[in-house]
Amino acid sequence: MAVFALVPAAGMGKRMGASINKQYLILAGRPILAHTLSVFEGASFVDGIFVITPEDEIPFCRDHVVERYGFTKVRGIVAGGAERQHSVLNGLRAMEGTVADDDVILIHDGVRPFVSTDVLARATAVAREDDGALVAVPAKDTVKTVEDGIITGTPPRETLWLAQTPQAFRYAVIRAAHEIADAERFLGTDDAMLVERLGRSVRIVVGDYRNIKITTPEDMVLAEAFLKELAA
């Protein structure tokens, strides 16, 4: 049972307000995407990586990230779609012929560079035994449900978790979930949701609050602080 990473990096990053897409912004001398790929490259149990990027950025990703930083595990760079879900489906289809049905696929945002090898390993172990694994952290704040500006409920905080990535599944499970969602024109907010709607069980893997998704200038400030902390 091999392990492959599928790394969506096709976002446009409008909230960042930068002239280039967020995955290529420089963090401590390297693109954010390069930091993320380094974690998978260095994980001995990860056998290969597929990166998803906008079609017109494939040469840039290949030349300035994959080849420049020597990511030898990258098996393919795949063109993204209109939405993240479409991009992931493109990636899963591109994996056909390379991965087996029971291989574990770690789907991880290209702009989450602080994921740890330990988290990857624990998510992989769960995905081998269950229908899927979702890395998440407990909610710290009280969450309200609201309609038309009026609070309609307060879910018990102990039941609320903030979803992160990676989200890990066996290839046959996640491929089927995405194909069915695509055929039914259902658009979910994450990969686990597509598996859940088929009646399958996705287990929580406790993550790390530092595993942030870098989408705003404020996130870049946090990321730089995390790097300084790690270097200390």
Swiss-Prot record:
Disulfide bonds: none annotated. The keyword Nucleotidyltransferase applies. The keyword Transferase applies. Keywords: Isoprene biosynthesis, Nucleotidyltransferase, Transferase. Gene3D superfamilies: Spore Coat Polysaccharide Biosynthesis Protein SpsA, Chain A. GO terms for molecular function: 2-C-methyl-D-erythritol 4-phosphate cytidylyltransferase activity. The record marks R15, K22 as: Transition state stabilizer. InterPro entries: IspD, IspD/TarI, IspD/TarI_cytidylyltransf_bact, ISPD_synthase_CS, Nucleotide-diphossugar_trans. Pathway: Isoprenoid biosynthesis; isopentenyl diphosphate biosynthesis via DXP pathway; isopentenyl diphosphate from 1-deoxy-D-xylulose 5-phosphate: step 2/6. It catalyses: 2-C-methyl-D-erythritol 4-phosphate + CTP + H(+) = 4-CDP-2-C-methyl-D-erythritol + diphosphate. The record marks R157, K213 as: Positions MEP for the nucleophilic attack. CDD domains: CDP-ME_synthetase. Its EC number is 2.7.7.60. It is an enzyme of class 2 (transferase). GO terms for biological process: isopentenyl diphosphate biosynthetic process, methylerythritol 4-phosphate pathway. Belongs to the IspD/TarI cytidylyltransferase family. IspD subfamily. Catalyzes the formation of 4-diphosphocytidyl-2-C-methyl-D-erythritol from CTP and 2-C-methyl-D-erythritol 4-phosphate (MEP). This is 2-C-methyl-D-erythritol 4-phosphate cytidylyltransferase.
